[in-house]
Amino acid sequence: MKTELPRKFILGFALAAALFFIFMVSSRPLLALGVLFLSHLLILFPTLVANCPWWGPVVTRFETPRREVWLTIDDGPDPIHTPRMLEILERFEAQATFFVIGERAAKYPNELEAIRAAGHEVANHTATHPSGTFWCYPPGRIADEIDRGVASRYFRAPAGLKNFFVHPALARRGMQLVGWTVRGLDTVKKDPAAVAALILKRVRPGAIVLLHEGHRTASEPDFHPHCLELTLAALTNANYRCVLPGKW
């Protein structure tokens, strides 16, 4: 999909709407407010809808003729979950990309190295995971979050939220923005079986599957590893393999 046209249109429309508001608010206030409101909606939609490509390309699947999926695991590394998840991945002969947080990678270097040593991939999920504010960061802070994260060809924004400064920053670094096809909502749901069932219901060949690690509670210290185990069992029973896709 060509994304440069909607990007330029949205920014151009926002500028025109601001000028229209300035010149028309006194004579046609409702019309001026309506145009300004529409311009804000056009900016917010690709910002807050994770897989929307209007600001630039978002990888949401990969091409394959086989029953293969790309498993991605966000928010690690974690000293408890990462070793357990690596053991589960090995048992199911599955590969995964771990989108790690830079500060956690620096805090847990052994777990980060264990991911790589097991043949999995490490990707950038910002330095601090500012999920509530990243989408409104200016260019300098976005660049800082990317640069202090791990070196990788792939980047995933916190909660998938991104503004129009993200793609230029990634392009300058030769990186791609990765979204997802299906997620298990494992930071919301409380039942690992429900997480696995949701993924299996929506998965298709070439899907990007999103799971998490590191969100531990006293009642469910192994919740995310359990989600991974049940998800891999369900995918295996459905004859899916978890692979690392090549470059696009």
What are the residue ranges of the model-derived segments?
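Divalent metal-coordination and catalytic microenvironments
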Residues: 74, 89, 98, 122, ...
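Catalytic grooves of carbohydrate-active enzymes
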Residues: 199-247
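N-terminal pre-catalytic segment of deacetylase/amide-hydrolase enzymes
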Residues: 1-71, 79-91, 230-248
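His/Asp/Glu-enriched short active-site or ligand-binding loop at hydrolase and phosphoryl-transfer sites
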Residues: 161, 166-202, 240-248
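A structural signal for short, hydrophobic/glycine-enriched beta-strand patches
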Residues: 126-128, 139, 158
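An active-site-proximal "capping" alpha-helix that borders the catalytic cofactor pocket
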Residues: 139-152
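Short beta-strands and strand-loop turn motifs
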Residues: 123-127, 179-181, 208-214
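Active-site beta->alpha N-cap acidic-glycine motif
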Residues: 43-134, 168, 172, 185, ...
